[in-house]
Amino acid sequence: METPLREQENSLESSNERSSYISEAAAAIPESANLGEEILSQLYRPLEACYNTCYCKKCCYHCQFCFLKKGLGISYEKSHRRRRTPKKAKANTSSASNEPIPNRIRLCQPKKAKKETVEAAVATAPGLGR
């Protein structure tokens, strides 16, 4: 029979062995966590400039920068505003667009008036009585 102190020491040794196994398993987890952190740091790292001008499939997908710029067409560069065309260039358009709008409306209105007069004449004309 062992003394109670030795039993406690043996139980402590066995618990230390278990904790060593746990620490080894826990040691494997941080490596994968480190890998995950490394991947995340790569995602949030500013993209490096790539000066490849080819738009083939291989070149569009070879890095994240090229994928965004060439594959998706996203560019964060300052875009230049387009200049307005001069007023003189606008005056050279077709003659129909130069005609004012009210004149066009007047051309259409007499046709409607003729229809109304025909309808009024039919309404006032005496019919064949009953």
Swiss-Prot record:
Annotated Basic residues bias: 79-90
**According to the UniProt record, where is the region Core?**
67-77
Where does this chain mainly localize?
Answer: host cell
Biological process per Gene Ontology, one example term: positive regulation of viral transcription
Question: What do the Gene Ontology cellular component annotations say?
Answer: host cell nucleolus
Give the region (Disordered) as residue ranges. 78-102
Q: Which UniProt keywords apply?
A: Activator, Host nucleus, Host-virus interaction, RNA-binding, Transcription, Transcription regulation
Q: Which InterPro entries match?
A: IV_Tat, Tat_dom_sf
GO MF terms held by the record: RNA binding; RNA-binding transcription regulator activity
Q: Where is this motif: Nuclear localization signal, and RNA-binding (TAR)?
A: 78-84
Q: Polar residues composition bias: which ranges?
A: 91-100
Localization in the cell: Host nucleus, Host nucleolus
Where do the segments described as Cysteine-rich lie?
50-66
Q: How does it assemble?
A: Interacts with host CCNT1. Associates with the P-TEFb complex composed at least of Tat, P-TEFb (CDK9 and CCNT1), TAR RNA, RNA Pol II. Interacts with CCNT2; the resulting complex is unable to bind to TAR RNA.
The entry assigns this protein to a family as follows: Belongs to the lentiviruses Tat family.
Job of this protein: Transcriptional activator that increases RNA Pol II processivity, thereby increasing the level of full-length viral transcripts. Recognizes a hairpin structure at the 5'-LTR of the nascent viral mRNAs referred to as the transactivation responsive RNA element (TAR) and recruits the cyclin T1-CDK9 complex (P-TEFb complex) that will in turn hyperphosphorylate the RNA polymerase II to allow efficient elongation. The CDK9 component of P-TEFb and other Tat-activated kinases hyperphosphorylate the C-terminus of RNA Pol II that becomes stabilized and much more processive.
UniProt-recorded name of the protein: Protein Tat
Q: Which organism is it from?
A: Simian immunodeficiency virus (isolate Mm142-83) (SIV-mac)
